A protein has these predicted regions:
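Long, low-complexity, intrinsically disordered polar/charged segments
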Residues: 1-11, 55-57, 71, 75-87
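Short, well-ordered beta-strand segments in beta-rich or mixed alpha/beta enzyme
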Residues: 2-9, 37-66
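Intrinsic disorder/low-complexity signal
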Residues: 6, 21-23, 50-52, 58, ...
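Short amphipathic alpha-helical segments
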Residues: 12-35, 68-74
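Short acidic, gly/pro-rich beta-turn/loop elements at beta-sheet edges
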Residues: 16-18, 60-62, 93
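Amphipathic alpha-helical interaction segments
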Residues: 21-25, 55, 62, 79-80
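Glycine-rich beta-strand-turn "strand-cap" elements at beta-sheet edges
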Residues: 31-49, 72-94
Length: 94
């Protein structure tokens, strides 16, 4: 299952979460996102990591393109985002 893994700095986590992520300007469900996870650094609560899970690689690639276009907008107000498509090879609960 392909996952789009994103990392970036935000000015303020709570504001970013409410006004950017929760507002969902990219239409996650319509774009094929099946699940998301948000994490942040314990040392820097404004450094976020997001994982968007898809059924297919083409869906993940299309979302990657949408996000690159969104990040070009100065209103995005996020610092140097990085994103890559990964695949989960193993997960086990203990």
């Amino acid at each position: 299952m392909p996952v789009l893994h994103i990392e970036h700095q935000v000015g303020d986590f709570d504001t970013w979460k409410r006004t950017a992520f929760d507002a969902d300007p990219i239409g996650r469900v319509k774009s094929g996102v099946r699940r998301h996870r948000i994490s942040r650094s314990v040392d820097d609560p404004n450094f976020v990591m997001i994982e968007l899970e898809f059924n297919t690689r083409p869906e993940a690639e299309a979302m990657h393109t949408v996000l690159r276009n969104l990040w070009r907008n100065p209103l995005a107000q996020i610092g140097a985002p990085t994103a890559r498509i990964i695949e989960i090879l193993e997960a086990k609960e203990y």
